[in-house]
Amino acid sequence: MPRRRVVAKREVLPDPKFGSSTLAKFMNHVMISGKKSTAEKIVYGALDIVSEKLNKDPLETFSEALENISPLVEVKSRRVGGATYQVPVEVRPARRTALAMRWLVEYSRNRGEKSMAQRLAGELIDAAQSKGGAVKKREDVHRMAEANKAFSHFRF
């Protein structure tokens, strides 16, 4: 950790189509090797597929999916007297959304559909309906925290 001043968070400019900064941040998670236009095509394509399939506002579905994936607690390793304990800690809001986005992209890439836009759309729809790989990951993280509840007095 820096001993000097805390570096200010940089604001992400909102995306051009929907005007959502959360969506712009998500595009940055989808982006590989700085190819932002490709990431934009993928995300917008996925949102088009979502709106086509569900006949709902795609941004609403996106935020619903993120809400269903966002973890509330996670475990952190803490070394106490030669033993390492998995200590459950609450996840702060910024990290919560970052983890949700990361998991959404990760489990989208592992899906079997043909294009990345289709994979992402499928994972978004599944996450909005509380199923799919990313939601399972969140449940695993919560289960891990619940199992290690006894060590919660080892605060950081």
UniProtKB/Swiss-Prot annotation:
- Please provide the record's keywords in A-Z order: Ribonucleoprotein, Ribosomal protein, RNA-binding, rRNA-binding, tRNA-binding
* Pfam families listed in its UniProt record: Ribosomal_S7
Where is the signal peptide, in residue numbers? none
| An example Gene Ontology CC term for this record | small ribosomal subunit
Domain of life, per UniProt, equals Bacteria
Q: Which InterPro entries match?
A: Ribosomal_uS7, Ribosomal_uS7_bac/org-type, Ribosomal_uS7_CS, Ribosomal_uS7_dom, Ribosomal_uS7_dom_sf
Q: Does the keyword Ribosomal protein apply?
A: yes
UniProt-recorded Gene Ontology molecular function terms: rRNA binding; structural constituent of ribosome; tRNA binding
Q: What biological processes does GO assign it?
A: translation
Q: What does this protein do, in the record's words?
A: One of the primary rRNA binding proteins, it binds directly to 16S rRNA where it nucleates assembly of the head domain of the 30S subunit. Is located at the subunit interface close to the decoding center, probably blocks exit of the E-site tRNA.
User: Subunit info?
Assistant: Part of the 30S ribosomal subunit. Contacts proteins S9 and S11.
Write out the similarity annotation.
Belongs to the universal ribosomal protein uS7 family.
Q: Which NCBIfam families match?
A: rpsG_bact
Protein name per the record: Small ribosomal subunit protein uS7
| Organism of this sequence | Saccharophagus degradans (strain 2-40 / ATCC 43961 / DSM 17024)
